[in-house]
Each structure stands twice: as C-alpha cells, then as structure tokens.
Amino acid sequence: MLITIPDLLTPEEVAYMRQILEGTAWVDGRSTAGDQAGKVKRNLQVPVDSPEARELGNIVLRALGRSPVYSSAALPAHILPPMFNRYDEGMTFGAHVDGSIRVVPGTGQRIRTDVSTTVFLTPPEDYDGGELVMHDTYGQHSVKLPAGHAVVYPATSLHSVTPVTRGSRWASFFWAQSMVRDDWRRHMLYDLDMSIMRIRSMLPDDDPAVTGITAHYHNMIRHWAET
C-alpha cells in the first residue's frame, strides 16, 4: 500500500526547515546504514543527535499529529525521530529493504519498522532524477512529489532512489511501528476508514449505515491491534 499525503507540511514550515538545513552540517549517510544497504547508499544526512535534527523532527511530528490520513494509513504505535537526507548530483541509493529493527537514539528502545515515510522538502522542478522507486511483483512505481507532500509505504518494500543528475533533493524520512503489523490488514483498515469518511459526508452520524460500518472498523482494530 502506497499512500501520498498532499501538504503534510505547510509552505511556511518547508521554507523554515530549508533555511535551517542550509546552515547545518551534513555527514555521510552510510553512517546509519546496515552492511548491505551501506554498499549501495550514496547520500548525506543530518546527524540524528544534532539540535537541528531534533528541532526539525518535532515540526514533522506535529504535522503528523494533525494528519488524519497518516494516522489512518500507519496506525502508529511508535514513531522514530524523523531524519533528514540530501542527494546532490551523482548521489543515489540502490535497491534495498529497510532494516526491520531500529533503536531510538539515546534510549536503547528497539522499534519494529512497519511503515516508512518520506516527506519531500525540495520542489521537483529544482532537481532531475531522485525519484523514490518501489519495486514489487507488479513492476516499478516512481514517486516524486511537491515540497511538503509525503508518501507512506510498507517498510517491507524493496525500494531505491534514482541518481540525481541536476540540483539537490532534500527530504525527511522516518519509520513507525504500527499497531497493526501486517500490511494487508492495514490496507483493508485504511480502505474501510476512507469509506467511512465518504459515507459520513453523505449521511448523518446517527444513520444505522454509519454506526454499523464504524462499529465494524473499530472491532477489526480491536481484533488486530497490538499496543
């Protein structure tokens, strides 16, 4: 399940974040990659323990908190602190799967990575290449979104970032442990929740059709969720 969230960040938030990132230090992105991913990863990242990463990460987390689409798609139990990367000319990230377990910086707490998210911080017209590509049994799916838009996808996905051939592509990325670890179940729950929203736009909340399907949704959550 691949879901895009338009305008997760406001234009003002994007502008502020880019201003801060312009003046921050960047390090080799391979410092946070595993052995296999490190062999195909060529990008730069903001150190996860830097003041800039913490400040900007909190902006992203607040944006997630006001996004019902993210909540419905990810059903997050825990969200790892958002990170920030950049791909300059010639930089790329070959096909890989994200590590299944990550440690929350400074705590030692281990989080299962069920859901991945990328938030684009650079307008697509400012760079060539840099598409996020999902590889699955149905082929390849490229994602290149406006600044402030986000894409949410299963962390189990084989994916890559194509080489940047002009400009620089900046983004925030992070993972969540979902209350529902199985992607197919999350997909069904998301589709059902979107149907509920559409029905509620046409019928009053006390209509039996609305209360019935809403009860069904919450009972499925109750059956599948881990907290």
From Swiss-Prot:
Q: Name one GO biological process term.
A: intracellular iron ion homeostasis
Q: Which cofactor does it need?
A: Fe(2+); L-ascorbate
The enzyme's first-digit EC class, named in words, is oxidoreductase
Task: Give the highest taxon in the source lineage.
Answer: Bacteria
Q: Which InterPro entries match?
A: Oxoglu/Fe-dep_dioxygenase_dom, PKHD_C, PKHD_hydroxylase, Pro_4_hyd_alph, Pro_4_hyd_alph_FE2OG_OXY
Q: Which GO terms fall under molecular function for this chain's record?
A: 2-oxoglutarate-dependent dioxygenase activity; iron ion binding; L-ascorbic acid binding
Q: Where is the Fe2OG dioxygenase domain?
A: 78-178
UniProt-recorded name of the protein:
PKHD-type hydroxylase Pden_4677
The species this protein belongs to is Paracoccus denitrificans (strain Pd 1222)
